[in-house]
Structures are given as C-alpha cells and as structure tokens.
Amino acid sequence: MSIVCSPRWKLIGVAGLFLFSPCVVAQKAKPAKFKVALSGRADFHTIQEAVDHAPATGAIIRIAPGTYHEKISIRSAHVILVGAGDRPADTIITWGDSAKNTGSTFKSGTITVFGAGFEAENLSIANTWWDDHPSQADRSQAVALQLEGDKAVLDRVRIVSGQDTLFANSGACHGDLSSPCAADRQFFHDCFVEGHVDYIFGEAKAVFDHCELHSRRHGNVMITAQSRHSPLEDSGFYMLHCSITGANDGSKVVLGRPWRDNATVYFYDTDVEQDIDPAGWSEWGDRLATSTYREYKSHGPGANLGNRIVKSPDLELGEEAKFSTARLLAGEDAWNPEREVKVLRTLAGSR
C-alpha cells in the first residue's frame, strides 16, 4: 500500500464529516497466480497459456513436475516461473530448434524473454538440437534461454544445450553510442549452465554466483562470448565463486573470446575442475586487445595461470570488495537480487 498525493485538494468524507485532503491511499496491485500441470486440476495445461494470461501486474506461475515440450515467448513484465518439484530436474521445459531450421540464432530459443523483472526458480530449460542431430552437417547454434530485460533473477535453474546455450542479453544500449549506458541487469544464483561453443554469450550485465559451468565435449569450447556495442556501456559477465566442470576428454577449453570489441568478463574465486587451455582466452577478429578479461583467485586442478595470453593486473587494497552482487548490480535504484532469491525459495517451498 502506498500514499499518493495530488497537487489538488480533494473533498473526502470521514465518519460523517467532510474534510479536505491532498492525499489518497493507493493499493499496490498484486501479481496473478496460476498453476500449470500436464494433466489434472490446474489453471492451464501449457506454460505458454499461463504466460499469455499474465496481467500488467505480472504473474507467479507454479509448474507441476513433468516434461513440458514447449517453445515459450514471454513479453510481459514480472513473470515468475516456479518449478513445484523437489529439484530442478523434476520440471523440464524443452524444445529443439536451431539457427539451421529457424533461420536465426535469435529464433532458436526454447524460452525467449523480453519482459523486465523475469524470474525463474527450481526448473530446467533445455534445447535438444545437438542431441537430436548428432551429425556434423547439422551443427548449429541452439539457444535454450534468450533473456533480455532488466532485473532478471534465476535461482536453481538448469540451462542446457550445445552451442549458444544462454543468451544473456541487453537491448538497453543500442541507441546513442556516444553516451554512458546502463545495460540490463541479470542475476544467476546456484544455476547449472551446460554447452560448448560460446555457451554463455550476450550483452547483459550479468552476475553468476555459485553457478556450475559445465563444458560438453567439443573440439573447441569457449565458455563465454561477451559483447558490448560501446566502450561506454557497463555490461559484462561476472563469475563469482563458480565452478568449471567437464570431462578432460581432449577438448580445448578457454574461458572466453570477444564477440565484439570491449568484451568484459571476470572470473573470481573459481573452482576449476576441468583442464583449461593454458592460454586461458582466445582471439576472435582481433578484438582481444580491446577486451577486459580478468581472472582472480582461481584454484583447483585445472587452474594454470602461468601462460595466460591476457594477464590480470594485481588487485589493489580493498578492490576485492567490488566482487559482490550488491556492488555490481545495485544500479541507481539500489536493486537487491539476493533478496529476490529468498522470496523465490519461499515460493518454491509453498504448496
């Protein structure tokens, strides 16, 4: 509830008396609540139907355990998807498109989000193109989640594909490239992301906190491909306290390559369980010199910092404090995505 005051005085009646007041009480609208299940009692039997019925105030969509074969588009703001199972693998949203059969990487996503304030909890999102088309001739980009919008939060979400698994993007900085610009903010907490070529890519300002980045077998594996349209925008990928896993099967694994000039990626306090190529990073179109690639406090059997082609300067006294979600994503509105995670876990625990 909030108090809204008008510049004009308004005549109101209270207990039979008439008073003049400049203020009225406004009730904050609540999001709709829907239940989705494959069968039985539910508001809807597909997730897309529930999304399509979301009002402007948003919707909390609880999804019963099961495998939902759907390609989902979310354009409304404040849509929250919550898996109602005991673990993320109990509720799976899956599809199998690619750039090859749709004509574009950006049409291949299993879930595509353009609404601000999107949240997801305790579920799995998969693109099965690479599993369904194992031949080399069919290799193609196949997005599982395309996410574009400010203040997105994902907690305990599994995102699985091959090439271009997670498109963590921002549409905020495509206009005037001569002025500073704040990119869309996204927070991934306790998530699992699997893929091989550029499997986390895009232009968002995204923090990955305590996530597992799992590399699939492939000749060349690039974990990230970050992008900026301008050196004045603040986008970047920040991997905080994450782990890098995958079989040591001969794949050449690097932390990332620059999709465009001024790519920005930080790995901080990473448990490197998989062997990483000693170079650490790879070139793409002579953009490496413009990029900001940093790696601090990596540890584990695959952490070998001696021969990195991009050297990380020593942290100055007190500089480590910037590697926190609160510092990185607060913005001008003091956003606190960690508080949203607590709310999401409460929603997942309710029945």
Question: Predicted regions span which residues?
Answer:
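Bacterial N-terminal signal peptides
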Residues: 13-22
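Bacterial N-terminal signal peptides that target proteins for export
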Residues: 2-12
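Sequence-level preference for short, compositionally simple segments enriched
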Residues: 29-351
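Short, low-complexity, intrinsically disordered N-terminal modules
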Residues: 5, 22-23
